Structures are given as structure tokens and as C-alpha cells.
Regions:
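Sequence contexts marking disulfide-bonded cysteines in secreted/extracellular proteins
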Residues: 22, 72-74, 102-104, 156-158, ...
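Negatively charged, low-complexity tracts enriched in Asp/Glu with abundant Ser/Thr
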Residues: 69-74, 138
């Protein structure tokens, strides 16, 4: 029951962000300024170089994305997942509700549940969603951010990076005695960073 409940909650978390609007524009402006001051000599667009094709990082418009939402369950191979330490990947029907699509995986460790998600949620949606904690993070993946709802579930967090085909995210939920020992946001950031590194350096 715990695992299914977590997965469904993750689907709801991603979907409800699309209607959220709050007041964290300053956070996004600060991030934009930081990007503007980065080296102008860098011309290569950061991307995930999957066997199925290149997934470039960048902004997207969920209203015009249509059917081109990236599906991590079918467009990332079993071998590519395994290289990042992700096994047991299976489609999760609860996530296929139009706003997101994704899959559950084997637990990275006992009491820690992991989902891989393709979402129409943008960084702006996440930053403006009421009751959510949002933060850009330092990572090898340019523009990665985390968000969670401490009211609905303080032990679940999603790390996401926006791409030209929607958000690519990994959600982590912690249960049992590990709730007070593991930071789900740190784990989610590590998992998504590992996927990026393994794909691009493999």
C-alpha cells in the first residue's frame, strides 16, 4: 500500500503544480541573472544524449508541447538506466494522466521509493505553486531544481530539469525510520545527476 500511495501522490504533486501560482518570481529572476553572467563563450547546449535521441535542456511551453512530452520509460533504454544504477523500471499508469508520464523502479535502498517522471510542469510552475518549497540547486545538470510540499508529504521531493520536451524528473519518497535520517531532496538530486553523468560520460 505504501508504494502505490507514494506513486499516486507523486502524480498528484506533479499535476497540481500546473495550476499553482504564488509569489516566488524573485527566485526565478535571481536564477536568470546568474545564467546571464555565466560564460558567453559556451555555445554547446547542455543535453542528455540518449540512444533514442538528444534531449536538450531549456525552457518549454506546456501549452504547445502537445504529444511531444518526453517519456522516460520508453525513450531511456534499460541499459542506460542500469548505467545510472536504476533498475526494475516499469510504467506507472497512475502517472499517465496527461500532465505527466513516468515509471516506478526498484528501490535504491530499503524504505526509499524512486520514480522517474516526464512532466509538463515548468520551473515557473513549481516556483509559483502555493505551499511548495522550491529551490535551484548546485549540480552538474544546468538548471536543476527541487520542489516538495511539506504539508502534503514532507518526506517526498522531486528533482527536475527543464528540457525542450518537458521536465525530466526523479521523485524520491522516504518511509519508516529513515524519514528522519534521509533528505529526499538530496537523494533526488544525486539520482538525476547520476543519470546525466552516466548518459553523457558513458
Amino acid at each position: 500500500m505504501g508504494k502505490n500511495r507514494t506513486i499516486v501522490l507523486g502524480a498528484v504533486l506533479v499535476a497540481t503544480l500546473l495550476t499553482g501560482c504564488g509569489g516566488q518570481d524573485a527566485v526565478l529572476e535571481q536564477h536568470a541573472e546568474a545564467e546571464a553572467t555565466s560564460s558567453p563563450e559556451t555555445t554547446e547546449v547542455p543535453a542528455f544524449h540518449f540512444e533514442s535521441g538528444t534531449l536538450e535542456l531549456g525552457d518549454f511551453d506546456p501549452q504547445t508541447l502537445g504529444d511531444d512530452l518526453f517519456d522516460p520509460c520508453t525513450e531511456i533504454s534499460e541499459e542506460e538506466f542500469a548505467a545510472a544504477g536504476i533498475t526494475g523500471v516499469e510504467n506507472e499508469p497512475a502517472l499517465y494522466r496527461g500532465n505527466a508520464q513516468g515509471c516506478r523502479t526498484d528501490q535504491p535502498e530499503p524504505a526509499v521509493t524512486r520514480t522517474v517522471i516526464g512532466a509538463r510542469t515548468t520551473s515557473e510552475d513549481a516556483a509559483n505553486a502555493a505551499d511548495y518549497e522550491f529551490s535551484f540547486v548546485e549540480s552538474s545538470v544546468d538548471g536543476m531544481y527541487t520542489f516538495k510540499n511539506p504539508i502534503a508529504n514532507p518526506y517526498m521531493c522531486i528533482a527536475q530539469v527543464d528540457t525542450q520536451r518537458g521536465g525530466l524528473a526523479i521523485g524520491i519518497s522516504v518511509s519508516g525510520l529513515k524519514k528522519e535520517k534521509i533528505d529526499p531532496c538530496k537523494v533526488a538530486v544525486s539520482e538525476l545527476s547520476n543519470l546525466y553523468r552516466s548518459i553523457n560520460n558513458g
